[in-house]
């Protein structure tokens, strides 16, 4: 299979070959929906890819916004990812416990803040484990570094942008939720859609 942006996805085989690269940071970007009654920050220390650090979307967000997981300021993102040992030269690979669900959001956040050298692990932790690769419960203490944001504002649309897209028909809006969440037959924080 070919991809429009093949650098955006790496295979488990690639990660297995490159796991010890000092220029690589592996991130667990797992986020569970509130209805799952699970806590990814509590689960991470029990089982993660060896050498991975945890990207906490609850912490790396705009704390002043009433909506969850809104993008943080450049300063907050820089501080938090720098504390994870990520600078602008590092290659970042993101995975999650579902395969590719929440890892894609973490990937997009890095792209939004100007980090292009980021990829999602195809198949995530389930595929990694199924293939017999190393997992760990050992804590990792990353060496803090400096990450400089280069915000890519075109990757976010506001209400006026969305309204114009709907009116003009010059774009397509996709709702990434499951059909049940979209239709309101499964629990959802917001029972609306465009």
Regions found by a protein language model. Give the residues of each.
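Cytosolic catalytic domains that perform sulfur/thiol-centered chemistry
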Residues: 1-192
């Amino acid at each position: 299979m070919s991809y429009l942006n093949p650098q955006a996805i790496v295979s488990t085989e690639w990660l297995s070959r490159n796991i010890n690269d000092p220029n690589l940071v592996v991130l667990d970007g797992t986020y569970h929906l509130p209805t799952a009654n699970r806590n990814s920050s509590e689960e991470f220390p029990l089982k993660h890819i060896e050498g991975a650090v945890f990207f906490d979307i609850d912490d790396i967000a705009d704390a002043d916004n009433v909506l969850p997981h809104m993008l943080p300021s450049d300063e907050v993102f820089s501080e938090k990812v720098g504390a994870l040992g990520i600078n602008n030269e590092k290659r970042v690979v993101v995975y999650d416990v579902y395969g590719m669900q929440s890892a894609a959001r973490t990937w997009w956040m890095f792209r939004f803040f100007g980090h292009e050298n980021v990829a999602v692990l195809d198949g995530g932790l389930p595929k990694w484990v199924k293939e017999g690769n190393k997992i760990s419960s050992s804590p990792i203490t990353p060496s803090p570094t400096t990450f400089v944001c280069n915000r890519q504002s075109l990757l976010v649309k506001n209400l006026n942008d969305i309204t114009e897209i709907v009116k003009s028909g010059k774009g397509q809006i996709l709702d990434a939720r499951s059909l049940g969440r979209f239709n309101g037959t499964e629990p959802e924080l917001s029972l609306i859609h465009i």
